[in-house]
Design a protein with these regions (language model features):
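Phosphate/NTP-binding elements of NTP-utilizing enzymes
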Residues: 2-335
Length: 335
């Protein structure tokens, strides 16, 4: 369907219907001044514009940054704007099933990764998503802080979450080491433990935060198998749906003889053999410096600091994996 044929459509989004033209939706990503009016959702309205809704949701799944641009346009006091590399990252994690991203400090990797999961939870009703890190309390802190930050910057996201925790049904819960967000469309986003306690759980997609700290056996034997069940649509599975079994690995650089480095090489080989399924992403300190997220003077001072280990600087800011000399020496002695 051409854009001019879809000129006026009522957009169902976040529990309310907004009157907006598709050209406004897909055009320039600025606040248009259009006054959005809340109205009652009816089954008849949904059926009448169902094809239009399908087209828009399909578009947003491929261009998630445009979805965020639209949500921001609903807020006249919006202050959130993407950097170019953040748009690239969002599109990559929505279009590929396997993503390995190695980024430096101040790259906003956790912020963007959690935003990607929230987009998936919104655009894929009934999705079961998780985050995991080396420690459960660590993953709970990352998830809760980033969701809270995103909801403040983009209030429309807050309307997608069931915040009432007083009901008998399990909804949004937040404790020291457990965070569960229940979305109004049936999706859930939670943190899980990198331990035997997670065995038997079922999800469709997950984020491995700071995967350099996750145990190899736990990841392969417990975490990855939780994603063996695909999302059902009307009782059927779409084999082409990118959500199913999608895995995002995010970390800073570590050691070359570690499991995380082997996983990086594995997904790199997958990206060569099947470029539509896997992708490798990376960025040094220069990217956040160019965008103003990191001070160049701060980086220069770190490089000149005699107490700062050069190998640590290479891992944290130059995206260079180090050779673990201790393990290497043990291997030489055994040989």
């Amino acid at each position: 369907m051409k854009l001019n044929e879809m000129r006026k459509c009522s957009l169902i989004l976040l529990g309310v219907i907004f009157s907006v033209s598709l050209n406004d939706l897909l055009g320039e990503n600025k606040y248009t001044g259009v006054k959005h009016i809340e109205d009652e959702i009816t089954k008849e309205r949904i059926i009448k514009h169902l094809d239009d809704y399908r087209d828009m949701i399909s578009y947003w799944r491929l261009y998630p940054d445009k979805f965020i641009d639209y949500l921001c346009s609903l807020n006249p006091d919006n202050t959130f704007h993407f950097f170019f590399y953040q748009r690239v990252f969002l599109r990559a994690i929505m279009r590929h099933r396997y993503v390995y991203a190695t980024f430096v400090r101040a790259w906003s990797k956790s912020f963007m990764s959690v935003m990607g999961l929230m987009i998936k939870a919104t655009l894929y009703p009934g999705a079961k998503l998780f985050t995991v890190a080396g420690g459960k309390e660590q993953s709970a802190g990352i998830l809760s802080s980033k969701v809270e930050e995103i909801c403040k910057l983009i209030p429309a996201f807050a309307k997608e979450i069931e915040w009432d925790t007083r009901g008998t049904n399990a909804k949004t819960r937040q404790t020291k080491d457990t965070v569960v967000y229940q979305f109004k469309n049936g999706s859930t986003l939670e943190n899980i433990a990198a331990s035997e306690k997670t065995r038997g759980r079922r999800f469709q997609a997950g984020l491995m935060e700071e995967c350099v700290g996750i145990d190899q056996d736990v990841l392969n034997e417990i975490i990855v198998p939780t994603m063996n069940v695909s999302r059902m649509i009307n009782g059927q599975v779409d084999p082409n749906e990118r959500l199913n079994k999608s895995q995002i690995y995010v970390t800073t650089a570590g050691y070359k003889n570690s499991f995380s480095y082997e996983k990086l090489l594995q997904i790199f080989c997958q990206s060569v053999a099947k470029p539509k399924d896997a992708i490798i992403l990376g960025g040094s300190w220069r990217v956040p410096v160019v965008e103003g997220l990191l001070s160049k003077d701060f980086v220069r001072e770190l490089k000149l600091d005699g107490t700062f280990n050069e190998a640590s600087f290479d891992r944290e800011y130059r995206l260079l994996y180090s050779l673990n000399t201790k393990n290497c020496w043990k291997l030489l002695r055994v040989a």
